[in-house]
Amino acid sequence: MTVNFDNAATTFPKPEAVRLALADAVKKYGGNAGRGGHALAMRTSAALYSARETAANFFGAQPENTVFAMNCTHALNMAIQGVMSGGGHMIISSLEHNAVARPAAALAKKSNVTLSVAEVFPNDEQTVESFRSLIRSSTKAIVCTIASNVTGQILPYKKIAELCRARNICFIADGAQACGVISVKLTDGINILCTSGHKGLYGITGTGLLVSDGKFPITPIMQGGTGSLSQSLAQPDFLPDALESGTPPIIGAMSVKAGIEFIEKTGIERIFAHEERICRGFISELSRIDGIKIYREDEAAYVPIVSFNIGDMPSEEASAILAERGYSLRAGFHCAALAHAQLGTKSGTIRFAPSFFSSPTDAAALASYVKKVKNSGKA
């Protein structure tokens, strides 16, 4: 038996429609998009553009401003380094994934970029004030996660976007844990949205998206063949070409398209309700066990993620015991040094993350086994 509750890392299983779309894409799209005028290349180009349109419509963007990336980390690096290429001040939150924190820290160390970290609180107004208090005349970008990959806490990103809009500051949002689970649109005030294709969007690994409203220029961090302006040694200055050097993840893009269509057909509210119902049931069961620490605050809102610890047992040791029974959960520090520093965890946490295909019965059985582990200290 293997039960996957590590869907915050990548969703599994994938919808049947995604699996079928992948099989179909491998059979049909054997050309290279934008590289050739023959039938295979043209058919593949049309399919890639269709995937781009689907993603653009889903996030309220224009297709030409919708860029396929290798993953969310790639998209965030393009956005952060591209927007901050001329220097300036940037602000990130204290719950950021290393996909934001590391490129930001590297820029602050090596270039004319200064960095501030805004503390996140359970209370949204306190969090917004935390960001507001750090804004300077030189602030060029605010980068924050929509939802923490450790606890699932949803940041007041729409209010943070208002701060940015009033001051002409670029707002870059990390949607890896939110997109496909809650509705996220550029009309929320986001200038550049970066997300993964293989998590809530149900695509395959090796896929990500950068979606821009086109208001802030993004200097390319990589140059190469784009299928356009091939006679010039200069990188194209228009999207998506400026940020899509080399062959894009064509087959992966087909999977993301199918995943988005699955979400639209199923209903994003229904997906969230199912996953959050499982989380609330799991929390209810854990709350009955003495010595279980659950990292959720009543005042905050969350996507369907629950971080917890079993007494003083190191999180990775506890997770390994659960894995022996067939339960897949991520433990440790979740590539989020800042978040765990704020939480004050000594050995990280165990992260429970269901998907639309998860079962409340399996979650209840896991909670029951957690109780046995807590009481015995072993499986």
Which positions does each model-derived feature cover?
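Pyridoxal 5′-phosphate
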Residues: 1-379
